[in-house]
Amino acid sequence: TALALTAAGALWCSARAVGVLAGADSGPVWSIPGTLFGGDTGSMDGLSALFVVIISVGAVAAVLYSRGYLAHCLAEKSPAHISLHYTALVAMFYAMLGVVLSDGGFSFLFFWELMTVASFLLILFDAQRREVRRAALSYLIMMHIGFVLLVIGFVRLDAACGAATFGALGDYFRTQPGLPLLLVFLAGFGMKAGLFAICLLYTSPS
């Protein structure tokens, strides 16, 4: 099931991405009329299309590889445990797609949080080990510190420009002092990217 869901999404998104890379107009991927930050859309341009292809290929490869990698765990873990792991893996794939396709802050933050929760569940695969539980909890705390910083950044952007979209960032930096917002976003994204050593202290070994 995980392979089918991942492959279906990968094929559909990759086909659309190849069209965009070839010069076709993809149109909106989604459009939400009213959210916390106003209207919100998702779209695919050349850069996001490239990332969609990379994510899709990587996700299908990860699911295929996991079948052999987890084979020895089938006798040790319950079917529900294995199902939860694959659910998190599929959710991670679609969350990453959502992140690169989001134009607005609301949808971006939604998929960013989904990516965090999915990663948390994946880290917890060997939850019977104390060090794994500690790593997962540390990861969750650090990611939510970063999430709060991103929310602050988008709220500031919305207050200054009337829109919390990536397109509004250009207007903001042309009309407002840019360094404070830049530092907030850098810290928020840096938590996920592992720019700070404390983010990787416990999670990387697990």
Listing of model-derived features with the role each one plays in the protein:
Residues 1-87, 160-171:
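Transmembrane helix-loop-helix hairpins at membrane boundaries of multipass inner-membrane proteins
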Residues 202-206:
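Conserved small/polar residues in nucleotide/adenosyl-binding loops
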